[in-house]
Regions:
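Fe(II)/2-oxoglutarate oxygenase catalytic core
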Residues: 1-159, 167-213
């Protein structure tokens, strides 16, 4: 068997959520009274702190959308580890590395919106990223890794998970040229973050193994 490549570590599950489930999550964004925020982080290639043009709201704990997203991400994490096992190449302790969400971000990319090349790891326990694409009524908005050298076109209900090791997993969302893209995203952590209560945790098979790097 050949050695796994970087692109092998990106796991995509097509049509995982139904149209109805996707609509439920979009509806929370549209009806939520939460502040519609913008985010900023360092541009991977210039090092400049850059504000992106999409808007974001935090999914409210115990809402219908929250439960859909939480169950989906937990299932995908388990599938991802089972998939990685097929390479017979990775440390078993990785199963204890993605047990908690940072938070569930509901994201809206209107026409002209994008997110610049960046990484998700903050140096404090973010080990993976997961995104759920919620609609397909838009043009542009392609998910791109490594300056566009690897691109993934996501459809409604698609779920994608990948590692978030600092500096290597540079990714972006290209500009929306028509329509509006909705997505849900979360960072996957080995310890609880501040956004949700500590009982918000994934039931990951084999996660009782000690982490040892």
């Amino acid at each position: 068997m050949t050695a796994p490549t970087l692109t092998d570590l990106i796991y995509l599950k097509k049509n995982y959520l139904s149209e109805e489930q996707c609509k439920t999550i979009i509806d929370e964004y549209q009806k939520s009274m939460c502040v519609e925020d913008r985010e900023n982080c360092f541009h991977a290639f210039t090092g400049l702190n850059t504000t992106s043009t999409y808007t974001v709201k935090t999914c409210q704990q115990d809402s219908k959308s929250f439960n859909i997203i939480h169950q989906t991400v937990g299932n995908i994490i388990n599938e991802y580890h089972d998939y990685l096992d097929t390479f017979d190449a990775f440390h078993v302790s990785r199963r204890a590395s993605m047990l908690y969400p940072h938070k569930y971000r509901l994201m809206k990319y209107s026409k002209g919106a994008w997110i610049h090349p960046h990484v998700d790891d903050d140096g404090a326990g973010i080990n993976g990223s997961c995104t759920i694409n919620l609609n397909s009524e838009y043009e542009g908005g392609t998910f791109a890794f490594w300056g566009g050298k690897h691109k993934v076109k996501l459809g409604r209900g698609d779920v994608m998970i990948w590692p978030a090791d600092y500096s290597f997993w540079v990714h972006e969302v290209e500009e929306i040229t028509e329509g509006t893209r909705y997505s849900a995203n979360c960072f996957l952590c080995d310890k609880p973050k501040f956004d949700y209560t500590q009982d918000v945790k994934y039931d990951v098979k084999g996660s009782d193994v000690a982490i040892g790097y």
